């Protein structure tokens, strides 16, 4: 006689980027093993790929392509799946800002962690009095490939390619140019023709993108100093 199947509950959440409602299940022991092995490797690419594989297995709504979701959707989705799988209290070690060395364990309720959307953020960039550009959010795949970092000069070329891939269209009052209909060379040359002020507006798009964020207070047991700490991005919640 075959062993019985264990029923797995399903839950729902709303994707921050689109407002779309999706169903998901907790990850199973076999999927948790994949995550543990990846985390132990301390390799960012392996960890990211493990998260992506687990999300593909856990998302139950048809038509959701995990690899194309914006990074903040990925982070929010994974955090919720993790909460339903192993507990909704997350233990994080925080380094006290006043001495930058003392670590304090803090328990965070996962329900309190949300994706923050900046009022300054817009995917519409004005280039001049007649020309506008519409951006699209980078996917997890694009971040893996580019190792995106504006401040790392060694990565500027890869960052440039990421920016080019995130331009959805360029338009004026009379005409629209979809980058899907352009060559990479054409898009790159268009970017290179910008002045510094125009390019900074593109940087602002990435810097103000929605992100996981949570504010906490920590007290240094050695000094008694209380500090405000801001956790941003998925990595901060697994410190």
Regions found by a protein language model. Name each.
Residues 1-239:
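Long C-terminal interaction/binding lobes of large macromolecular proteins
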């Amino acid at each position: 006689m075959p062993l019985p199947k264990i029923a797995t509950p399903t839950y729902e959440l709303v994707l921050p980027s689109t407002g779309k409602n999706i169903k998901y299940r907790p990850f199973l022991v076999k999927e948790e093993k994949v995550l543990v092995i990846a985390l132990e490797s301390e390799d960012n690419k392996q960890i990211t790929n493990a998260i992506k594989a687990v999300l593909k297995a856990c998302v139950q709504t048809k038509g959701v392509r995990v690899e194309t979701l914006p990074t903040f959707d990925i982070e929010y989705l994974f955090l919720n799946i993790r909460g339903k799988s192993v507990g909704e209290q997350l233990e994080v070690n925080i380094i006290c800002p006043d001495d930058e060395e003392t670590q304090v364990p803090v328990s965070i309720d996962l329900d309190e962690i949300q994706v923050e959307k900046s009022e300054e953020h817009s995917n519409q960039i004005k280039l001049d009095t007649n020309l506008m550009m519409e951006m699209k959010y980078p996917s997890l795949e694009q971040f893996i490939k580019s190792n995106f970092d504006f401040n790392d000069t060694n990565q500027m070329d890869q960052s440039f390619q990421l920016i080019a891939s995130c331009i959805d269209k360029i338009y004026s009052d009379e005409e629209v140019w979809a980058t899907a209909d352009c060559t990479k060379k054409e898009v790159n040359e268009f970017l290179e023709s910008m002045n510094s002020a125009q390019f900074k507006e593109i940087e602002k798009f990435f810097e103000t993108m929605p992100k996981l964020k949570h504010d906490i207070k920590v007290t240094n047991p050695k000094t008694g100093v209380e500090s405000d700490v801001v956790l941003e991005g998925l990595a901060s919640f697994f410190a």
